[in-house]
Amino acid sequence: MVRTKADSAGSSASSGSYRKAVAARAPRKTFGSSSSGSNHVTSPTGKKSESKYAGGNPVCVRPTPTWQKGIGEFFGSPSTSQPEKENRIPSDDEEAGGSGAGKAPRKSRPLPPDPSEEAADSDDE
């Protein structure tokens, strides 16, 4: 612990007990009526700030690109949107559980012999 000058001055230092130094706190912003009007800070855009933060950069406002989807499309109810392939019952020609990427079954076949390995094998003999 740290002793301060106030702790060393006086009779309390001789008794061995001392007080811990407490850091000062920064003043907090108050969102309401304030006693002094000079402390009132406005937003950089000059507009009155809304009660909720809507995201984005308030200093350099940029337009939303046309390709960006709206947030309502993500939270829309599934009954109004078209059912996804994952959520519907597979038809007879589809196989359940398959990704559908490769329709033909793949057969494993050995790799062709490497010519550099064959040359190394013939040198050993």
Curated annotation (Swiss-Prot):
Annotated InterPro entries: PCNA-AF, PCNA-AF_dom
GO MF term list: chromatin binding
Motif (PIP-box): 68-79
Claim: Cytoplasm is one of the keywords in the record: yes
Motif window: D-box: 28-39
Placement of sequence motif KEN box: 85-87
Keywords tagged on the record: Cytoplasm, DNA damage, DNA repair, Nucleus
Keyword DNA-binding: no
Pfam families in alphabetical order: PAF (PF15715)
UniProt feature, compositional bias: Low complexity: 8-17
Major subcellular site: nucleus
Location of the motif Initiation motif: 95-107
Bias type Acidic residues, positions: 115-125
One Gene Ontology term, aspect cellular component: perinuclear region of cytoplasm
Renumbered residue ranges of the record's region Disordered: 1-125
Compartments, record wording: Nucleus; Cytoplasm, Perinuclear region
Main function: PCNA-binding protein that acts as a regulator of DNA repair during DNA replication. Following DNA damage, the interaction with pcna is disrupted, facilitating the interaction between monoubiquitinated pcna and the translesion DNA synthesis DNA polymerase eta (polh) at stalled replisomes, facilitating the bypass of replication-fork-blocking lesions. Also acts as a regulator of centrosome number.
Protein name, per record: PCNA-associated factor
Gene: pclaf
